[in-house]
């Protein structure tokens, strides 16, 4: 049994390492996002005894780790996997020593990490090229302006209040999209306007929000070097991704009679 637990730990480590490769941190799932795997809500007693329910729970736990590996491109042979598990469980002779099993798993992990790194590099190159092409075409559209840093923006509603500085706290409403239109974050999904220090978000936001007056609205087109660069962010923002944000500057400072609320997602936080 000791061998099973050690191999399971290595398997889980492989899944987590592959998932983390090239990513800063994963955004917590919003209320609108579906669970990774669907589940039938019902009486667990239908599975059987407490022992059988626990067995099912352990299978689900291991299955999730293996599914995570598969999603990162590291598939295993389930037939061989279950054969080995059954042999150990039944006390039969197994085809590997504990040392050999650890050596094989470490080699497997290294190979998968190398594949993940190569994929990350390829994705970064492709995303950068797509982003540059998008921004080149977008720059010629009516109302779109480009700053010296490369940030593009379009004012959709002029505000009438004050303009913030980079040292201010601001309250905003926003929606973030990839250039293919995929929405990856929004204040609406997070429960309403969010409040944060303007100096603690990605450079494209720090610069862009300063162009607005209170009540003003704009669309920001943020090149990757002003966003998350080659590292990307979470599961939705790939390496060198160009981002599009619709933003409304509700006010400078926190809402009256309400504490400052940090963004529920990571998608506009500053990259260290």
Swiss-Prot record:
Annotated protein name in UniProt: Probable FKBP-type peptidyl-prolyl cis-trans isomerase FkpA
Other noteworthy facts: Present in outer membrane vesicle formulations which are used as vaccines in human.
Localization of this protein: Cell membrane
Ranges annotated as biased composition (Low complexity): 29-40
Region (Disordered): 29-48
SUPFAM superfamilies to which the protein is assigned, alphabetical: FKBP-like
Membrane topology, from the record: Lipid-anchor
Covalent lipid adducts (S-diacylglycerol cysteine), residues: 21
